[in-house]
């Protein structure tokens, strides 16, 4: 355990740094268990969404992120898992505050489960066949069965699986941390970059995750984190 995690933010995490917004709107975070205001985050403008998307696109198309060995991405995921685990008490405390769940649920599902997701995806990534040779018997297509071909007619293909690019993700408010981790970790292992739209009623834990992403050394633009209402969220997924 360490010091309490922040409860209020005035900036978004975009392109590797906390980035000011010209938004005048905010989301007020109210603790369901006490009814008290415990924090706030900005509400994204179109310009903020564009900046986050541009950062993700740049990191994907203009840097070596997608072509790095999967081992490097897995190591970053494991570093983040370790950081999450070290912060699990403060995270659980924050989640009880902003989500109103019990301490037990906060401990197990919200604070501990994401550690498992990041570690699991790192392990899967290391052993995943991103490239495999496939062999097909084309004899029947070449009339082999009817024509009595003596030579087998086979073809081999190298099938590669690669990242799709920038990925927007959203998680349900009641599973903000595990939901975000379940979506972002596999995208990261694949070599994608991500824009995370946090759930507005309880954005604070995922904003805390942004600082951890920064601290363990994810490159700028690989993971971007914003808060947005329905209109700007629709704009995000329209890209």
What are these regions (language model features)?
Residues 1-146:
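N-terminal Rossmann-like NAD(P)+-binding subdomain of aldehyde/semialdehyde dehydrogenases
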Residues 129-239:
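Rossmann-like NAD(P) dinucleotide-binding subdomain of oxidoreductase/dehydrogenase enzymes
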């Amino acid at each position: 355990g360490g010091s309490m995690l922040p409860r209020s933010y005035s900036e978004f995490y975009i392109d590797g740094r906390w980035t000011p917004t010209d938004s005048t709107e905010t989301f007020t975070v109210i603790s369901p268990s006490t009814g008290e205001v415990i924090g706030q985050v900005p509400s994204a403008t179109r310009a903020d969404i564009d900046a986050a998307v541009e950062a993700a696109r740049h990191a994907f198309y203009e840097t070596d992120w997608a072509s790095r060995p999967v081992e490097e991405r897995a190591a970053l995921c494991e570093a983040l898992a370790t950081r999450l685990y070290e912060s699990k008490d403060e995270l659980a405390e924050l989640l009880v505050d902003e989500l109103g769940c019990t301490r037990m649920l906060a401990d197990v599902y919200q604070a501990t489960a994401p550690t498992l997701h990041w570690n699991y995806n790192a392990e899967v990534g290391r052993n995943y066949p991103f490239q495999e040779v496939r062999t097909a018997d084309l004899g029947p297509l070449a009339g082999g069965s009817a024509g009595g071909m003596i030579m087998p007619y086979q073809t081999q293909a190298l099938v590669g699986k690669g990242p799709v690019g920038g990925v927007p993700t959203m998680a349900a408010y009641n599973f903000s941390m595990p939901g975000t981790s379940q979506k972002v970790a596999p995208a990261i292992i694949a070599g994608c970059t991500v824009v995370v739209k946090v759930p507005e009623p309880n954005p604070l834990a995922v904003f805390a995750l942004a600082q951890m992403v920064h601290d363990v050394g994810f490159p700028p633009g690989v993971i971007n984190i914003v808060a947005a209402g329905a209109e700007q969220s629709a704009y995000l997924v329209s890209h």
